[in-house]
Each structure stands twice: as C-alpha cells, then as structure tokens.
Amino acid sequence: MGLGQALSEDMRYVKGQIMNANFFDYRIPYSVDTPEMDVTIIESNDGEGPYGAKEAGEGPIHPVLPSIGNAIFDAVGVRMCELPITPDKIFTKIKELK
C-alpha cells in the first residue's frame, strides 16, 4: 500500500468526476512490483481490541512514504513534496536545481 501510494497511485478528477475509477486506469502495484517480504507472526492478546486483535493494516504504511522521499533526496538532492513520486516529477525538480 505505501509503495503504491508513494510511486504510482494517483486519483484524477475533472469537474468533480473521478477519471480513473478502475484498476486499469488507477495504477496499483502488483505482487511482482513489490519486494519479497519475510513475515513473522507474533502471538499476543490485546485486551483493548475486539477478540484481542491489534491493528495491522494501515499503520505499517506510514514510514514508507517519507522513506522513499528521503532515499530520493539522498540519491539526487531534491525534496519531493507531491505524491505520487514519478520519474518525470523527479526530473523536473532536478532541472529546477540547475
């Protein structure tokens, strides 16, 4: 989720209408686009969550966006402040530096 949000997912609107409301036009990463993951299951019981469950969905995506932005800054010296971060946006920022 975080990788797609940072690099490819972009909702497009024209006069309030969504122009890319399907998975053909709205680009999300496929499994082949993402790195291999090593998953570790940790058994625990949280009395606050329903049936002892803990949140495990949205929380882990938060560090992905700034990590990618900082990696780009370290590599080419430009700060990206708009998502998704695309090659053409990076190229434009690099040209603005010169």
Language-model segment annotations:
Residues M1-K98:
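Cofactor-binding beta-sheet edge motifs in enzyme active sites
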